[in-house]
Amino acid sequence: MDQTRTPYFDVLLDYVDSGVIPFHTPGHMQGRGMDRSLRDFLGDNVLAIDLTQIRGLDDLLQPEEAIEEAQQLAAEAYGADNSFFLINGSTSGNQIMMMAALNPGEKIALPRNSHKSAMGGLIMSGVAPVWMKPEVDVGLHMDHTVTPQTVRATLDEHPDVRAVYVVSPTYYGATADLEGIAAVVHERDLPLLVDEAWGPHFRFHPALPIDAIAAGADLSINSTHKMLGSLSQTAMLHHKGERIRVDRLKSVVKLFLSTSPNLVLVASLDVARKQMATEGAALLSRTIELANDTRRRLNEIPGIYCFGDDQVGRPGVFDLDPTKITITVKALGYTGYEAEEILRRRYNVQCELADLFNCLALFTIGTTQDSADRLVYGVKELSREDRPIDVFSPSGVLERRLQTGTYNLPAIPPMRMKPREAFLADTELVRFKGSAGRICAEVITPYPPGIPVISPGEEITPEIVDYLELEKKAGVRMQGPYDSELRSIRVVREPHGGIWIPQT
């Protein structure tokens, strides 16, 4: 196929050029009915192609014309049998993969550091999780990936598992031995589902880790908006092989798409594919070179450590995406949260995420030399500062953790109910500090990085209470709970009842 083509973007442009008078949605009528402040900011061109799925513009839920051709071009570019454009991000992609691969009540093996959208998939699908423990680097305070050995041991212990789901790469860029995992999974004729949200660029440069489809995944999800040139919310789902029924997959995809999709988002996927298929290698060569040079410069700053190839080969780090730069600041006496805040407030540099010890900087095809220089300057100035540990955090309780240089992550709690059962059960609010021993009925996710610490159906342990209390004191935002301050938590109601109402 001709990868220089952008069939869907082209039909939108043709519609605009035709001068059609619209009497259809959206109501702003190509910007004419929009408030001028927003119209002037967005520009007429964007608003002109914010159209609806009328005749000639195809239908994302039932593509037969330009969208179908655009998806076929994407499948060829990614080495897949089928590719699907998504406008609800990899969140919907993760949930689609589970519902397409399994039936309610069946079991799926997945790592504990799966994104919270995977928990949403478990709740919606009625699938039961068998948790796998990823490899952990306690010194860096981060989870990596699961190994083929862990997958094999899990399947040996749970022979009734019907699919395996893995995360590769992680937020920090560590990738799994996907070929090894695929061999383990496929020898039992099970499907392998891969959350490759952070790896949409892997396919297009030999210096990057192998992509999931090439490694043997049956389904994989890519957040093209995270690392490539498409707009926010956009992602692609890729399918290869015969273990997943294509008719069922297409039916599930439709459940997660709007009947009024933003066609600007769809067009951005079409154009981003063309850009990577035709220019990706050159663009990524520059990005990788810039990232590696910046990593080297950062490592020359006293008290700063940015891991790279030195981590490859360690447990859970089969390979590494060089475009992710993890800036470890614990030797400076700062938390990652504080460092992120200082970089933003004082040096106008915004990192992707922070955790207890680290800040993460993403380098993409849009990162410039000037931007990299600003990052290096900000971190260099940060290293010269002499500030107390609680300069931006509400409490200095983290000082001992920083001095020891380690941080123990909580163990996976016992599962007492299936996630769907607990989520839909009769519930009550109880004081969080006194909730140990109760069955959780909601997802508690420190964000970023968006990995649930406890999920519906799991027993709240004292260790988890302590962990989340410390995260709260460090200023971490909690996503998922009814009480966003986590003074209370929703649990499955017990026969004796009783609702705790937090004081205002």
Where are these regions (language model features)?
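PLP-dependent enzyme catalytic core of the Aspartate aminotransferase-like
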Residues: 342-346, 351-504
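Conserved N-terminal alpha-helix of the aminotransferase class I/II PLP-enzyme fold
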Residues: 46-92
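A generic structural motif
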Residues: 170, 275, 331-332, 365-369
